[in-house]
């Protein structure tokens, strides 16, 4: 047990019970955002397709314990929570890899101001754990050069307009033939679509998207 866990015992992000960052009961309560055997059709509520984005799926429904855990990861200065969350999502991530083949994992970037405020980029933390668990490479190829307004009140078209020009390739970055862009929450897929557009413009031929949870 780590010293920090002795001095400050962790509590479950889902139910608040002390002993772990995410207890077994809450992890077991995570509801899949798609059928166990993922069928990659547009009618599937867990699957999204777009102009630049070939395909995107989410592991879980954004509800109950999943919502609490992702909100704590994003706003509660709990970087360690990325590990159990990403590990829980590995089966869904592996199902996407069966379709995508060998790819580079690319996290959705946050603006430098937001990164300083939180101390980390939650999408990058999740992407590293997913990539390590699946045995595929990860690289922060994208940067967020422009801060954007809050998007929760915008529809998909509004979000795409809001994100126009927000993402760029990092200096010297060379996109691979295929990539998976990773984010924490999938709502309209506008963020994944915007990132995919930059990667495609940079030479990437196929871009997939993966999120821990989807609002349904």
Task: Give, region by region, the residue ranges found by the protein language model.
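Glycine-rich phosphate/pyrophosphate-handling loop used in enzymes and phosphotransfer proteins
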Residues: 1-216
């Amino acid at each position: 047990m780590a010293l920090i866990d002795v001095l400050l015992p962790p509590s479950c992000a889902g139910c608040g019970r002390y002993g772990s960052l995410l207890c077994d009961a809450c992890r077991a309560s995570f509801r899949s955002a798609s059928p166990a055997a993922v069928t990659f059709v547009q009618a599937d509520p867990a699957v999204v397709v777009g102009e630049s984005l070939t395909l995107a799926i989410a592991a879980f429904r954004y509800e109950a314990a999943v919502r609490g855990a992702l909100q704590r990861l994003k706003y509660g200065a709990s970087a360690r929570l990325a590990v159990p969350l990403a590990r829980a999502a590995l089966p869904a991530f592996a199902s996407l890899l069966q379709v995508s083949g060998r790819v580079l994992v690319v996290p959705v970037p946050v603006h430098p101001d937001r990164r300083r405020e939180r101390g980390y980029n939650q999408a990058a933390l999740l992407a590293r754990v997913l990539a390590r668990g699946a045995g595929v490479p990860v690289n922060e190829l994208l940067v967020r050069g422009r801060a954007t307004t809050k998007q929760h009140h915008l529809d998909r078209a509004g979000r795409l307009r809001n994100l126009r020009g927000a993402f760029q390739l990092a200096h010297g970055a060379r996109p691979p033939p295929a990539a998976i862009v990773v984010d924490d929450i999938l709502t309209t897929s506008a963020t994944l679509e915007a990132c995919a557009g930059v990667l495609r413009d940079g030479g990437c031929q196929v871009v997939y998207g993966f999120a821990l949870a989807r609002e349904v």
